[in-house]
């Protein structure tokens, strides 16, 4: 069940959502009381963004709203507030480098500069081939003991050196 409707009673916009994403959304909806279904929006948007290529289209946000049974504006508010969501086309692999205090003191700024030089892009840009997107700076990613660190596609990489970064980037083709 989804809200007060079964999965078979979907709207045309639900065609944007894969069966895998619908299952993931349903799993999150089941964790909350029916009057708190908005609590599943972040998980739903994250699943959709990952599933459809790294950013949220208006059609995808509409489909999430329809599927969960929320006003579209509530989904747009979440998608545009949190830095984990992209609403424009970006590279396939999302890179976030922590440059907060622990990472900064351990070379995070140098790691970021190395990535910018290696990829030929600045923060907020994608490579011309669409392979990488260097996200705007994230807040602390809570891996201070193993600084400097970065995330690529939500996977943590810690104790970075320029050589380790090159190996990581080479694996993400």
Model-derived features with residue positions:
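Signature of N-terminal electron-transfer/Fe-S-associated modules in redox systems
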Residues: 2-173
């Amino acid at each position: 069940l989804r809200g007060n409707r079964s999965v078979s009673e979907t709207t045309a916009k639900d065609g944007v959502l894969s069966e895998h994403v619908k299952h993931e959304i349903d799993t999150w909806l089941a964790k909350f009381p029916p009057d708190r279904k908005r609590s599943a929006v972040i998980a739903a948007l994250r699943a959709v963004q990952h599933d459809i290529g790294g950013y949220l289209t208006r059609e995808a946000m509409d489909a999430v709203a329809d599927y969960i049974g929320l006003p579209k504006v509530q989904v747009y508010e979440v998608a545009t507030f949190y830095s984990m969501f992209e609403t424009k086309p970006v590279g396939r692999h999302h890179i976030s480098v922590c440059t907060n205090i622990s990472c900064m003191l351990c070379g995070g700024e140098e790691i970021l500069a190395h990535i910018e030089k290696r990829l030929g892009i600045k923060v907020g840009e994608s490579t011309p081939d669409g392979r990488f997107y260097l996200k705007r700076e994230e807040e602390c990613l809570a891996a201070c003991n193993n600084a400097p660190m970065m995330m690529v596609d939500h996977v943590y990489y810690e104790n970075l050196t320029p050589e380790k970064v090159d190996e990581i980037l080479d694996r993400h083709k």
